[in-house]
Amino acid sequence: MDHDLLPLRGRPKKLDRNLILHSALMEYWSKGPSNVSINDICKLTGASKPGIYREFKSDDGLKKSALKIYKTLAVQPLLNILYSDQPIYKTIDDTISFITQDRKTSGIPNGCLLVMMAALSEQLGCSTLKELNKIRADIYAAFFHCVERSKLENGFLGMETDVAAYFLENQHIGAMRMQKEGISNETIAKVLSFSFKMVFQKNSNQYN
């Protein structure tokens, strides 16, 4: 018997972790995390269900890992803008441009995975929920920093910093919901510009 033709035994073929994470992320992002199962990921990638469980331990583990990738791809660039030391009006312009970028050109879905997960927080596992809350706290902290910096430039309306930070964070959330609903980026940009005028008074003439 030709031993080269014998079926392989021992440890299973190594799972492509990056493929699994990318596929899971895009499915969660485009369809919603509650509408995608591990079976769906298996069919999409050709991976075995036991293999995915060995790698990620659970559906919760897979979602948490995908969420970390999402932060790197879609959240960290926003944080970098908000923490930049450029003039505040430029920070606002860049923030609006980032939020309303053409997703088709970048090959990513419309909307925000964080917003979708937050709406389903009661259905999330403990580790995914913990990661979600951490990322949301990071976004709030970045807006808080941006507001504090604007005060140093005398470009702030006078609202309490924490209130303004929550307001701006929720403008971001609202913009993502509008985008998911198919509202044009041009319209969303106008809404955001109007909202930012309410907070950053000094820069209101930048958006006329």
Stretches with model-predicted labels:
Residues 2-8, 19, 23, 27-61, ...:
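Helix-turn-helix
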